[in-house]
């Protein structure tokens, strides 16, 4: 069961209550705090598109604490981040693993952050196949194609070669915030309130 806090705000018309995510959205903050699936991806995409429509010139802050999840759902969010006009600052708190790491790296260059105790993990996509051999072969080819595409995206955002990324993602590759900075997934390790000044 998921409990969502409610925030009460005083306005000139009286009190107004918001669920915490709606209140954060008012400040152009989107929070990705679950495993990534199609439903979550659609919610995040809708928030990004709403914020772009509201003010296409003002930054959006995407906070990430996710173990990863569906590659196709993550790619839908990735494409949206690249598509919209506002800069998207990405901030890892806790973890950005697998597809979460891809989204962390996809933020606007110079605006990708992690808190000091955050961890980042990259690896190749995983999948399972059942059924006829011909169907299994189709799914394996698609998985290999997705792996290559993910490696190309990480290469684009980190500055590492596709060959280096391919080697690194053969197994789970864990990084501290400082190591993610050295790798090129983030641009800065931040601490208390530093982001508000940027």
Curated annotation (Swiss-Prot):
Q: Where is the active site?
A: 98, 123
Its catalytic activity? Hydrolysis of proteins to small peptides in the presence of ATP and magnesium. alpha-casein is the usual test substrate. In the absence of ATP, only oligopeptides shorter than five residues are hydrolyzed (such as succinyl-Leu-Tyr-|-NHMec, and Leu-Tyr-Leu-|-Tyr-Trp, in which cleavage of the -Tyr-|-Leu- and -Tyr-|-Trp bonds also occurs)
Family annotation (SUPFAM superfamilies):
ClpP/crotonase
Give this protein's Gene Ontology molecular function annotations: ATP-dependent peptidase activity; ATPase binding; serine-type endopeptidase activity
UniProt entry tagged with the keyword Nucleotide-binding: no
InterPro entries named among the record's database cross-references:
ClpP, ClpP/crotonase-like_dom_sf, ClpP/TepA, ClpP_His_AS, ClpP_Ser_AS
Q: What is its main location?
A: cytoplasm
The record's keywords, sorted A to Z, are: Cytoplasm, Hydrolase, Protease, Serine protease
Please give the Pfam families that the UniProt record associates with this protein. CLP_protease
- What are the GO cellular component annotations? cytoplasm; endopeptidase Clp complex
- Which family is this sequence assigned to? Belongs to the peptidase S14 family.
Where found in the cell? Cytoplasm
Highest classification ranks of the organism: Bacteria, Bacillati, Bacillota, Clostridia, Halanaerobiales
According to the lineage, what is the superkingdom? Bacteria
Q: What is this protein called?
A: ATP-dependent Clp protease proteolytic subunit
State whether it acts alone or in a complex, and with which partners, per the record: Fourteen ClpP subunits assemble into 2 heptameric rings which stack back to back to give a disk-like structure with a central cavity, resembling the structure of eukaryotic proteasomes.
Some GO term, biological process aspect, for this entry: which one? protein quality control for misfolded or incompletely synthesized proteins
Biological function:
Cleaves peptides in various proteins in a process that requires ATP hydrolysis. Has a chymotrypsin-like activity. Plays a major role in the degradation of misfolded proteins.
Q: Among its keywords, does the record have Transmembrane?
A: no
State which Enzyme Commission number(s) the record gives.
Answer: 3.4.21.92
């Amino acid at each position: 069961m998921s409990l969502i806090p409610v925030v009460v705000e005083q306005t000139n018309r009286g009190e107004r209550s918001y669920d915490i995510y709606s209140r954060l959205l008012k400040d152009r903050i989107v929070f990705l705090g679950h495993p990534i699936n199609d439903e979550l991806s659609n919610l995040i995409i809708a928030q990004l598109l709403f914020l772009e429509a509201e003010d296409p010139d003002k930054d959006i802050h995407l906070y990430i604490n996710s173990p990863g999840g569906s590659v196709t759902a993550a790619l839908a969010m990735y494409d949206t981040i690249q598509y919209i006009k506002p800069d998207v600052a990405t901030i890892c708190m806790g973890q950005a693993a697998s597809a979460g790491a891809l989204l962390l790296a996809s933020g606007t260059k110079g605006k990708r952050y992690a808190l000091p105790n955050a961890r980042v993990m990259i690896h190749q996509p995983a999948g399972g196949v059942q059924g006829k051999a011909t169907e299994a072969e189709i799914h394996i080819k698609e998985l290999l194609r997705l792996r290559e595409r993910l490696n190309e995206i990480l290469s684009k955002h980190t500055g590492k070669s596709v060959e280096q990324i391919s080697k690194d993602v053969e197994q789970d590759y864990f990084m501290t915030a400082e190591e993610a900075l050295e790798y090129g997934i983030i641009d800065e390790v931040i601490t208390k309130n530093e982001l508000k000044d940027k």
